[in-house]
Regions:
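Conserved glycine-rich cofactor-binding loop
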Residues: 17, 24-25
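Rossmann-fold cofactor-recognition segment
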Residues: 61-79
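Conserved NAD(P)H cofactor-binding loop of Rossmann-fold oxidoreductase domains
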Residues: 101-108
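Catalytic loop of short-chain dehydrogenase/reductase
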Residues: 108-109, 118, 144-195, 202-219
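Ankyrin-repeat alpha-helix packing hotspot
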Residues: 125-126
Length: 232
């Protein structure tokens, strides 16, 4: 079944607003496109405003009757998250769903630290936790929260004592960060949330640009693998 035939079987999103973090590329951009296709409006929360505005311009040329807003959002930066939450509460508290898609997978040759922890963990897990901690207590009404999980969550990994532990490989960092995201989902889904509902999605093997910072031969190998895998 083609993606459009599949989407045609789903309910319309007319008069509904969906917020997507990291909505300028990869899975996030695909989600934005499909929400617009189903008649919804979108708020793209993104770090790169220039790229976000380019995406907005292209999409509105196709979906002229839809509405797209942009909120500056760097999931590795505490102040950026808090500022973005304030904007959501003031301008977009009527949102139907929040898709927490933003995330990174660092190249081991360009490992960076933020607040004395690896950027992958800071962005993928700590940032999501801070977003929800600041947003949920101030929200009213019914809202859906969609966590972006991963097939690697829960894989056997190196034991750590703190999220600030060092000497972790890029893949170990990613496993820890995505295991943390899924732990957040299980935590919130067990609470009495007064109209809030929580969902966990795992995209499986998907062709995205999450490894865009890796050496060219790794990016090439990844594309070849996915092409072979999806040919069956």
């Amino acid at each position: 079944m083609s993606i459009k035939k599949y989407l045609n079987n789903l309910q319309q999103l007319s008069n509904k607003k969906v917020i997507v973090t990291g909505g300028t590329s990869g899975i996030g951009l695909s989600i934005v496109k499909e929400v617009l296709f189903k008649g919804g409006d979108v708020v793209i929360m993104a770090r790169n405003l220039s790229k976000a505005n380019e995406v907005k311009e292209k999409l509105l040329a196709k979906y002229m009757n839809r509405h797209i807003d942009i909120v500056e959002y760097d999931q590795s930066d505490n102040q950026s998250i808090i500022k973005a939450v304030d904007i959501v509460l003031k301008e977009h508290q009527d949102f139907y769903a929040l898709v927490m898609n933003a995330g990174i997978f660092q190249n081991k040759h360009k490992l960076c630290l933020k607040d004395d922890m690896y950027l992958t963990i800071k962005t993928n897990y700590v940032g999501v936790n801070l977003l929800l901690t600041n947003l949920l207590p101030k929200l009213k009404g019914e809202h859906r929260f969609i966590f972006q999980g991963s097939l690697v969550a829960g894989w056997h990994n190196k034991s750590i004592k703190s999220l600030k532990d060092k000497n972790l490989s890029a893949f170990q960092q990613y496993i820890i960060s995505k295991s943390g995201v899924e732990a957040l989902f299980y935590h919130y889904s067990t609470l009495n949330n007064n109209g809030f509902s929580f969902y966990l999605v795992e995209p499986g093997l998907t062709s995205t640009d999450i490894i865009r910072d890796f050496p060219s031969f790794i990016r090439w190998a990844g594309k070849v693998f996915l092409k072979v895998f999806f040919s069956f």
